């Protein structure tokens, strides 16, 4: 079985650390980033199966990440998380082809299930 590559982008270190630890226990290869700029540079070097990104970050936001991912790798699934969930944010994300959308605080069990569904869609 090949190992799936997951990228997590969130400006809260605790979210990145928690996601990395939990997802690595499931056997995923996980890379985390505290802002989008180095994450997008890494995406140009390496393909990821799923990208989990915060919606609201300084500099490049989650919607810009979503557009960049879909431009580079149209079949890579993007999961968005945010502490600022509202209907407009959700609609914008869904129009941008986000796979799933979660409010913070992030529930790791839900994230794991969403990642598994995203990977199943890719098969």
Label the model's feature ranges:
Residues 16, 58, 86:
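The feature encodes the CheY-like receiver
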Residues 27-34, 42:
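Short hydrophobic/Thr-rich beta-strand motif most characteristic of the beta2 strand and flanking loop
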Residues 34-38, 61-64:
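Acidic catalytic/metal-coordinating carboxylates
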Residues 88, 106-115:
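C-terminal output helix
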């Amino acid at each position: 079985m090949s190992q799936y590559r997951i990228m997590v982008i969130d400006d809260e270190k605790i979210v990145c650390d928690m996601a990395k630890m939990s997802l690595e226990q499931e056997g995923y290869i996980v890379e985390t980033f505290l802002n989008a700029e180095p994450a997008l540079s890494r995406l140009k070097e390496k393909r990821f199966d799923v990208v989990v990104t915060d919606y609201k970050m300084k500099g490049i936001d989650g919607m810009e990440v979503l557009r960049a991912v879909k431009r580079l790798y149209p079949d890579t699934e993007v999961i968005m998380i945010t502490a600022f969930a509202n209907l407009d944010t959700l609609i914008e994300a869904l129009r941008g082809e986000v796979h799933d959308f979660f409010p913070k605080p992030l529930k790791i069990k839900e994230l794991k299930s969403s990642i598994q569904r995203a990977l199943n869609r890719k098969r």
